[in-house]
Structure formats: C-alpha cells, structure tokens
Amino acid sequence: MPANNNKAPSASSKRRSIRFVFYFLSFMLIVGVLVGCSSSPYQPLSPQLTSKKQNESKEDLGDEGKPLPAPIRQEHSQWIPVPWSSLPGFDQDRLHEAWNAWLKSCQKPVPLIGDLCLDVRRLSISDGLEQRKWIVSRFQAYKVENLSSNAVGMLTAYYEPELKAHREASDTFSIPLYGVPYGVKAGSLWHTREAMETNTGAMEQLKGHEIVYVADAVDALILQIQGSGRVEVTEPDGTIHWIRLAFAATNNQPYQSVTRWLLDNTEWREFSWPGIKKWASNNQNRVREMLWSNPRVVFFREEPLSNSDDHNGPRGAEGVSLTPGRSIAVDPKSIPYGTPVWLVSEGSNVKLRKLVMAQDTGSAIVGAVRADYFAGSGSEAGEFAGRIKQDLQLWVLWPNNKQP
C-alpha cells in the first residue's frame, strides 16, 4: 500500500484558520450593523391601512388620468375636488352597513342624488367591491372646507336615551314631558324653561299637553338635548309598553350648556352626564337653578315602537329613520340632506373611517366641517356618545357633472 505523503495539519495552522474565520465574521457583523444604522427603522403600518395592502390602487379607484372638476361653493362651505385615492381607508369600509342608511334616504329622494336610487336599490344585494366600484364611477369626491380653507372641524355624537315614565303624575314620577303647546310657532320665541315653571300664563298654555312624567329632572333634560328617546310607559291600568318621544318643536330659545353653569357657579368638574346627575343628587336645592340656566325646551310627539324599530333610530331632519353608526347630523347650509359623506375622525377615544349619510341636523350643528354622529339607543350608546368630541374631516360624494 503506498504511503500517504500529506502531512497532518499542525495545531498552529488550526489556530490560524480559526483566527481568520473569527476576523472575517467580525468584519461582516460590523458591516451589517453600519448598514442597519444607515437605514430607516421599520415602521409597521396602521392596522386600518395594512389589510389588502394597496389593493386600493389608482387603477382600482379610477383615478388614472381622470381630470378633476371645479370646486363647488355652498353657503357655509366649499368643496374641493380630490382623487379617490386621497380618502383615508376608503377600501376598508363595510359598505353594506352604510347601504341600509342610503336606502332609507331613497325613501325621500332629494334632487340629483335621488336620481341614482334605482342603482342604490339594485346594488343593495351586491358585495362591497361592486358597491365601491359603482360609487367611484358615478360620484366625485370633494373635501369639505370652511370658507377660510380650513378642512378640520369637530365631531360630536348623540343617541336615544331609554328611560321609564308614567302616564299620570305621582310623587315619584312628577317631571312632565310635553307635546307642542298652543302658541308655539317656528321662528318665534316662546316662554323660557324658567317661565314654564313660574309664569301662570305659560303654565295654563301647557295644561293638557303632558305626554308622560319621568322621575328625574336631569333625565328629562338629557332627553330634550338628544332630541328623542325610547320610553317604557306605565299606563293607569298598569299595562307597560314602549313608545318613542320624537322631536316635534322647541320654544326657540337659545341653547345654553349646563356644564357652563356648573363651571361658573360650583367647584364641580365631572361634566359627564353621570357626573352631573351625581352633583344634582347631592345638591337638590340648586338643581332648578342649574336647569333654568338653559332656557331652551324641546317638545315631543308620541310615536309607537314595534319590534322592527329595534335597529332603527328616530326620524331625522331628512324625514327618514336614522341608522346607528351610519347617520350624521350636519349643517344643511354646508352639506345637503341625503348626501353620502366619507367621514374620518381620529381621537384618543375612537377612530372612524366610514361612509355615512347626512340625514339630520341640530341647533348646535353649525359650520362647514361639523357633524354629530348618531350612536344608537340606550346606555351603551350614551356612554359612547359622551366620550366623542374630536377632530373631524369630511368628504362629500357628489354625482358626476352635477351642481347642487
């Protein structure tokens, strides 16, 4: 057998090889660190924007090469045309939820937008992709600004309170809620809240217009501020059923917040409704004074409630029932009733990016970028509504080649 002439590696040569590998790996590690330091750190996208990551392409939204029309001016706002790709989260919304609210607006179609109601009804059984494509093809998006070109406004929320009442007054249920009394006329001042409790003539005019009696004066005020409510009524014969007290009219007096009175006249600083009720329970001798600081009173009309009304709110100013989470109150001098609106509001309490319908208004809802978000009925909706006061952006969706 021939001998093997190759020498076995010495210990020193092994050490040299190991040192070479160590130096090489150290060099590569240093290079890697330097390269990493020169790069921007990875920033995860917002969860609202990562889903379907950029399936929201310009092609999908019909923006490619599409010229923008001229701005549109309203009495309290201006609408600036923008590409669909500029609407935050437009490809993420569950449009079928908004479609129910849109169908309600089609019950009382307004000019121009109402002309598209046949398509709205046809698409009610389509998926969100088909609905989105139709919106993009038939509408132009406009960013809403005030007349000074400010596009950021304020979002609040409202809801339908639920409370118990009796048809007849008692020691416990003694606070009346009224229908429209004689002499109340649109645009004309009527008696203040204080006068309704102290003026003989005002009290005479109110007689016979009591609808129900509630147990708590602050609950009555909340119901008036929200504009409507669901009431569990006990009748004189003991039967119990639900009714809706819907907005009918006001005394046309200016609205003043009771929180302003508390701020100016007490040390109390818990301005949520539970906080205000807590103050009232501890200061019964001053409750009337607090309530009288707001001279505005709302009058109601009674409406029956059925099982089908569980998912429907009260009728808004457009004349159709409101949809929780999909109806907003607006200034009609900024945005017409029945208009589809893309709403974006991001605060510490909630983030909203969704299609809503302009279906209501309110005395405090004035200005270009101003909306009141209908949260639904009951205590959970009330708790949500009480937390919402945050920045707002709005985009009007208006039919192509049409002027309001």
Q: How would you name each of these model-derived features?
A:
Residues 38, 310-404:
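C-terminal soluble interaction/assembly domains
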Residues 23-33:
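Bacterial N-terminal signal peptides
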Residues 1-17:
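N-terminal secretory signal peptides that target proteins for export/translocation
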Residues 78-305, 309, 345:
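Secretory/export targeting leaders with adjacent low-complexity proregions
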Residues 77, 150-152, 224, 238, ...:
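A generic structural signal for short, non-catalytic loop/turn and secondary-structure boundary residues
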Residues 52-86:
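N-terminal low-complexity, Pro/Thr/Ser-rich intrinsically disordered segments
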Residues 35-63:
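Bacterial Sec signal peptide processing site at the extreme N-terminus
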